[in-house]
Amino acid sequence: MSSKYPRSVRRCLPLCALTLEAALILLFYFFTHYDASLEDQKGLVASYQVGQDLTVMAALGLGFLTSNFRRHSWSSVAFNLFMLALGVQWAILLDGFLSQFPPGKVVITLFSIRLATMSAMSVLISAGAVLGKVNLAQLVVMVLVEVTALGTLRMVISNIFNTDYHMNLRHFYVFAAYFGLTVAWCLPKPLPKGTEDNDQRATIPSLSAMLGALFLWMFWPSVNSALLRSPIQRKNAMFNTYYALAVSVVTAISGSSLAHPQRKISMTYVHSAVLAGGVAVGTSCHLIPSPWLAMVLGLVAGLISIGGAKCLPVCCNRVLGIHHISVMHSIFSLLGLLGEITYIVLLVLHTVWNGNGMIGFQVLLSIGELSLAIVIALTSGLLTGLLLNLKIWKAPHVAKYFDDQVFWKFPHLAVGF
């Protein structure tokens, strides 16, 4: 059986990808160099371990989390790794160019790699809404546009609102979710009759998705604390994230059983809701003064995630035609907004406790940053969706959505692989 992947794309994609990689190599040759400062060995090892945690989360966690479609698990894992590798390279260059004026040599440090990895992770989150409906060439365009849009957002927030690295990246959950949902909304929506089977989850891919959720669950404190400079803030961020995640697990399993008429547990609900606490405390994890607050936030986040996973597909998939919206929307966008609201409330309380009279100004700044992030996400997502609809990319036909056979060579073709 011959591949249904358009022949023109199969022929030009390797050449285009290698040409893009060669261009990146030249940019690294002319515009980058390693940090020559002497850093103590203990600090170097600790910094590398945080970067390693982020890479595990991105490559294994987010890669396997999106592999729950029965006939699209290979592409989900491999395409995520491809996007991560490309996104990190482009993010390092872009962050270096945007952070200095006039432009000069980009200094590569372990911290800049951490920052680039988190920027690339936003693409992997967004791609969860479109994987199975686009080819690799379209994903390359999506990586370049989204990393550029997120870098621009960070630069604008940093210059206008004068925030540090952690604060100007705290919106990346919301940004990634709404960017991905906007791109998915622009793509061809209906699945033809007879192809709905490709959109179904199976037991083995669901176990793979749960494995990805476990990787994310174990290493999520590293994401929430990766860009914090103060040791006290890093400690608070890690502790509060662990407490919130622990409560999310209990809430996910209990809530999943409660949501089923026969009190059975749904793997789909569980592998999304166990991560709810980590997303919800991501923005404010360093400000939470007591573990019980993080635990309450994890409980509320778990319930919202279960409710979103149960209710949103019924109304949103039919109205918007966006597949996989349950995980994307109930985890990252809804809980990202919950985290933003929590941050504003804690900021107000912190300002009152310290006797600062600038409460209204601080709230206005926070709302302005969030609004700017959503506007840029929707605008750049719409632009990306329109670009991906161009015929030059030879997008997969809707009859071949969520089908690994379009992209991969199999040693044998068997029904239900």
Curated annotation (Swiss-Prot):
Pfam families, alphabetized: Ammonium_transp
Bilayer-crossing regions: 12-32, 44-64, 77-97, 125-145, 172-192, 203-223, 238-258, 265-285, 287-307, 331-351, 358-378
Tissue specificity remark: Restricted to tissues or cell lines expressing erythroid characters. Isoform 4g and isoform RhPI-Alpha are expressed in immature erythroblasts but not in mature erythroblasts.
Effect caused by changing residue 233 to E: Found in antigen RhEFM
Annotated phenotype, changing residue 41 to R: Found in antigen C(W)/Rh8
Compartments it resides in: Membrane
Coiled-coil segments on the chain, per record: none
Keyword Membrane found: yes
Membrane topology: Multi-pass membrane protein
Entry keyword Transmembrane: yes
Family: Belongs to the ammonium transporter (TC 2.A.49) family. Rh subfamily.
Annotated protein name in UniProt: Blood group Rh(CE) polypeptide
Encoding gene, per UniProt annotation: RHCE
